[in-house]
């Protein structure tokens, strides 16, 4: 395999560093060996890692064919390959960089398994299962478990979780108890389903492999066959793993098998964007990287090129309140863009008013030149989308639902609508039964229960049915004499009015589906306790399990905030329906940021939310005012908004805790190492009674 010339390498190495900030440059030129790049949201991660690969190749440290880069989505792998080809095509990097292998874990494993299979397994052939559903349904039937579609999908997801965590069927029951996990079926029943499923995949001289098996068999081949391992490790010498906070134990096992005793590994991630633990992902490997490799080079990318300083400031405060070991690795981002508008916090009386208010705000942004395709409404669960779909439809604003179907296009909603139509066509319905009771009676056989069922798919189906029941109740409340036939007609009209998805429309997406994306304007909607954090994260768990679940919800909120480039609006409603009891509370994650100054929006009712300073004693209130005076003077000196120095929430915490030294000050949410170094002495002087002005 040819190596690039020294002259070409020197030219390319110089060109590759052009336009990089100091931290990005440090990551690119870090020596071969264990390297950990902690990359915050918007910090140019993809640009950095592709240039690191190109630098290693162009500088002659490793040949392009000896590099394997892996990530978690086909889209991310494709983007990495495109960037490398562009660097090669433009002469910035060695031409061979365009041939570097950048794949998902599963794609890389399948390629390797096809090559090594005959030597490892022999004459037994294998086929990749394109769908697990039929096999899991058959396994469930044999185990006398539920075989309705949602149950089968939940059983499938649980098998995937168990395999990703390296949990064998016989170990499942003890594992779910140890991890405090809700099983979609009684553990002993699920164990039989899991066992049956694994047995069904083997038939004579043919094996069916699912995507997890690709990883399992690849790891086993390298672990158990020294000749195969030596050949693979001679081919691939240098590895890079993107989104390392989302790796599963099974993926780490494959990575360890690839590496052997070597340490030429670069990992990139942000533990505070860990939001997929329900799939088996764990940030533990990222958290322990320096422990495993004490000599590792660690680089922190903290310059945020995506969002305005105002959005970055809020994001820092959100994650600054995090607790637990993951929070110890948080990155305090530093906004690099010009100043923009302050994030807006808006309270509404009910959900419909909230959705209409968001639609009106979108109209205003459109009038100011923000394209619909550069705006997004993000929410915690897919079932929340209906009210926003309706508001956008009524406002004639185009939209698309990402990572899911439109509300009326979902299978469970279509089935429920069919049942309601059938009920409306009956002639034997009693006239004295209230419409809400009639609707509930129709929906109960389709899965509407008092409490959410276990299992992700079953819960999502239930959430859609609850949303449909609530929509029917709201329509009935607005029209007291509404009949079931009229209700069905109204629902059908709403379904028909939803325009087909359009590429250039406003994006509606769950927070999970929004990961990795960004927009000029983002609306984080429905931010009430029980929705974010989600009710089952609060649940009846206690101790570490409950704390971990709530902290993952906080990280999900953080991911939502960091999707916004410029305009960020956070909204919540006090009641579900118009005129309903205002029993809802804003998300607990909003508590430190509720309106306390002129920079935030008034609530829709015209009343301000209670400020976060109400609990301060007179001395604390006086200190808060002095801190505000200092902040204003400092902001003027730096020519930045006061929000960028410290938020009101941070000043309130300082006034409450009155830290005596830097060690105490840095523990306060919103004060990281950078702000401690920059403002710490001045703040402590104000706390001690002087230094204002």
Tell where the protein language model's regions lie, with residue ranges.
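Conserved helicase C-terminal RecA-like lobe
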Residues: 183, 371, 385-397, 406-596
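C-terminal accessory/binding modules appended to enzymatic or scaffolding proteins
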Residues: 611-660
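P-loop NTPase Walker
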Residues: 1-122, 126-127, 230, 284, ...
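ATP-hydrolysis module of ASCE/P-loop NTPase motor domains
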Residues: 31, 96-99, 118-199, 204, ...
């Amino acid at each position: 395999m040819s190596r690039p010339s020294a002259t070409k390498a020197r030219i390319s190495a110089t060109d590759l560093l052009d336009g990089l900030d100091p931290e990005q440059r440090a990551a690119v030129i870090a020596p071969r060996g264990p390297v950990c790049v902690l990359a915050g949201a918007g910090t140019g991660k993809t640009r950095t890692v592709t240039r690191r690969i190109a630098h290693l190749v162009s500088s002659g440290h490793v040949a392009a064919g000896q590099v394997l880069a892996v990530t978690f989505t086909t889209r991310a792998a494709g983007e990495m390959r495109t960037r490398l080809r562009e660097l090669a095509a433009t002469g910035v990097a060695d031409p061979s960089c365009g041939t570097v292998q950048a794949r998902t874990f599963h794609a890389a494993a399948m390629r390797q398994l096809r090559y090594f299979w005959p030597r490892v397994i022999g004459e037994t052939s294998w086929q990749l299962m394109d769908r697990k559903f039929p096999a899991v349904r058959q396994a469930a039937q044999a185990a006398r478990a539920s075989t309705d579609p949602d149950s089968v999908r939940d059983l499938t997801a649980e098998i995937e979780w168990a395999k990703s965590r390296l949990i064998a069927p016989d170990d499942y029951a003890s594992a779910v108890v140890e991890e405090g996990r809700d099983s979609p079926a009684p553990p002993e029943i699920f164990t039989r389903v899991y066992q049956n499923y694994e047995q069904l995949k083997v038939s004579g001289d043919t094996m069916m492999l699912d995507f997890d098996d690709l990883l399992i068999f690849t790891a086993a081949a390298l672990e158990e066959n020294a000749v195969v391992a030596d050949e693979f490790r001679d081919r691939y010498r240098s590895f890079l793993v993107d989104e390392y906070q989302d790796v599963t134990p099974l993926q780490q096992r494959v990575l360890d098998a690839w590496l052997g005793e070597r340490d030429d590994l670069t990992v990139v991630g942000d533990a505070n964007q860990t939001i997929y633990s329900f799939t088996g992902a764990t940030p533990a490997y990222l958290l322990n990287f320096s422990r495993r490799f004490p000599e590792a080079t660690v680089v922190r990318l903290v310059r945020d090129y995506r969002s305005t300083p105002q959005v970055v400031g809020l994001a820092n405060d959100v994650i600054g309140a995090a607790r637990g070991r993951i929070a110890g690795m948080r990155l305090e981002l530093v906004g690099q863009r010009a100043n923009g508008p302050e994030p807006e916090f808006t309270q509404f009386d009910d959900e419909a008013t909230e959705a209409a208010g968001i639609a009106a705000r979108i109209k205003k942004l459109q009038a100011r030149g923000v394209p619909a395709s550069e705006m997004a409404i993000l929410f915690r669960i897919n079932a929340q989308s209906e009210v926003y779909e309706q508001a956008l439809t009524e406002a004639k604003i185009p939209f698309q639902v990402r990572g899911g179907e439109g509300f009326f296009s979902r299978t469970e909603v279509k089935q429920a609508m069919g049942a309601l139509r059938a009920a409306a066509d009956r002639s034997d319905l009693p006239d004295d039964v209230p419409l809400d009771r009639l609707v509930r009676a129709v929906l109960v056989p389709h899965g509407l229960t008092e409490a959410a069922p276990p299992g992700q798919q079953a819960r999502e189906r239930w959430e859609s049915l609850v949303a449909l029941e609530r929509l029917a109740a709201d329509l009935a409340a607005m029209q007291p004499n509404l009949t079931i036939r009229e209700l069905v007609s109204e629902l059908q009209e709403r379904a028909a009015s939803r325009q087909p998805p359009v590429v250039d429309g406003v994006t509606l997406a769950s927070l999970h589906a929004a990961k990795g994306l960004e927009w000029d304007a983002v609306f984080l909607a429905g931010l009430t306790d029980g929705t974010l954090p989600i009710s089952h994260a609060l649940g009846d768990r206690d101790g570490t399990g409950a704390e971990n679940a709530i902290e993952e919800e906080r990280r999900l909120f953080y991911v939502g905030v960091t999707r916004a480039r410029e305009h960020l609006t956070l909204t919540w409603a006090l009641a579900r329906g118009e005129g309903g009891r205002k029993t809802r509370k804003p998300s607990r994650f909003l508590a430190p940021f509720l309106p306390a100054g002129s920079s935030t929006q008034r609530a829709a009712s015209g009343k301000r939310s209670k400020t976060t300073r109400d609990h301060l004693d007179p001395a604390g209130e006086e200190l808060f005012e002095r801190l505000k005076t200092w902040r204003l003077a400092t902001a003027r000196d730096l020519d930045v908004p006061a929000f960028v120095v410290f938020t009101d929430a941070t000043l309130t915490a300082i006034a409450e805790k009155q830290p005596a030294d830097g060690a105490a000050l840095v523990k306060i949410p919103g004060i990281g190492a950078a702000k401690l170094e920059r403002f710490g002495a001045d703040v402590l002087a104000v706390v001690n009674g002087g230094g204002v002005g």
